[in-house]
C-alpha cells in the first residue's frame, strides 16, 4: 500500500486563469512544485488521489501559487479548495547527511544533554536564516528551538529523539 505525504493545502483560487493558492507543508517547495512534477490532490477522506502536472509555480506573500495542466480557469479549480496536495513516498528524494524531512522531525522527543525531557516537536517554522522547531511542553508554553549546530547536538530519527544544548536564555 502506498504511503502518502502531505505537501500542502489548497486554501483558495488566485485570479481567473486557474491558479491555486497553497499553504505549503513541504521542506523544499522549489523542488516539490517544479514545472512538470506530478502531484496528487486528495479528497477529504484520503481515499481518492487525482494526479495533476504542475505547469507553473511562484511564491506570493506566504503562499505558493500553482497551475496544473488542463486546468486553465478559476471554475475548473474551484472544486479543489480545501483539498490536500500529496506525494507518494517514492517521490521523496534522498537527503544529505544532517538534513531531514519535516515528517521525520515532528513527533520526536527533545531532551537536554543532561537527559532532562523538554517535550515533543509539534511544528517546524521557517522564518528566515534557519528553521525553528516548536516543542510542546507537558506544562507551560511551547518552546522555540533554533535548528543550528550550537543548539541541536544530535538527531536520532530511528529512536525519534533529539538532544539539544540549552544556551543561556533559551528556556
UniProtKB/Swiss-Prot annotation:
Compartment(s) of residence: Cytoplasm
InterPro entries: PRC-brl_dom, PRC_barrel-like_sf, RimM, RimM_N, RimM_N_sf, Transl_B-barrel_sf
Keyword Chaperone appears in the UniProt entry: yes
Domain PRC barrel, chain residue ranges per copy: 96-170
Gene Ontology BP, a term: rRNA processing
Pfam families reported in the protein's UniProt record: PRC, RimM
Main location per the UniProt record: cytoplasm
Segments passing through the bilayer: none
Any GO MF annotation of the entry: ribosome binding
UniProt keyword Cytoplasm, yes or no: yes
UniProt keyword list: Chaperone, Cytoplasm, Ribosome biogenesis, rRNA processing
GO CC terms of this entry: cytoplasm; ribosome
Superkingdom of source: Bacteria
HAMAP family for the chain: Ribosome_mat_RimM (MF_00014)
Similarity comment text for this entry: Belongs to the RimM family.
Entry function: An accessory protein needed during the final step in the assembly of 30S ribosomal subunit, possibly for assembly of the head region. Essential for efficient processing of 16S rRNA. May be needed both before and after RbfA during the maturation of 16S rRNA. It has affinity for free ribosomal 30S subunits but not for 70S ribosomes.
Notes on the domains: The PRC barrel domain binds ribosomal protein uS19.
Subunit-structure text: Binds ribosomal protein uS19.
Protein name (database record): Ribosome maturation factor RimM
Species: Bacillus cereus (strain B4264)
Amino acid at each position: 500500500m502506498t504511503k502518502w505525504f502531505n505537501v500542502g493545502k489548497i486554501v483558495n483560487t488566485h485570479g481567473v486563469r486557474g491558479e491555486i493558492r497553497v499553504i505549503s507543508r513541504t521542506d523544499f517547495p522549489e523542488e516539490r512544485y517544479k514545472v512538470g512534477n506530478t502531484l496528487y490532490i486528495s479528497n477529504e477522506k484520503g481515499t481518492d488521489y487525482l494526479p495533476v502536472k504542475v505547469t507553473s509555480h511562484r511564491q506570493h506573500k506566504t503562499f505558493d501559487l500553482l497551475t496544473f495542466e488542463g486546468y486553465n480557469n478559476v471554475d475548473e479549480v474551484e472544486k479543489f479548495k480545501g483539498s490536500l496536495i500529496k506525494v507518494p513516498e517514492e517521490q521523496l528524494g534522498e537527503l544529505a547527511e544532517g538534513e531531514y524531512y519535516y515528517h521525520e522531525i515532528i513527533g520526536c522527543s527533545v531532551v537536554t544533554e543532561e537527559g532532562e525531557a523538554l517535550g515533543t516537536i509539534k511544528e517546524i517554522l521557517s522564518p528566515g536564516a534557519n528553521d525553528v522547531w516548536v516543542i510542546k511542553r507537558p506544562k507551560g508554553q511551547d518552546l522555540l528551538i533554533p535548528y543550528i549546530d550550537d543548539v541541536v547536538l544530535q538527531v536520532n530519527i530511528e529512536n525519534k529523539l533529539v538532544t539539544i544544548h540549552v544556551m543561556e536564555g533559551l528556556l
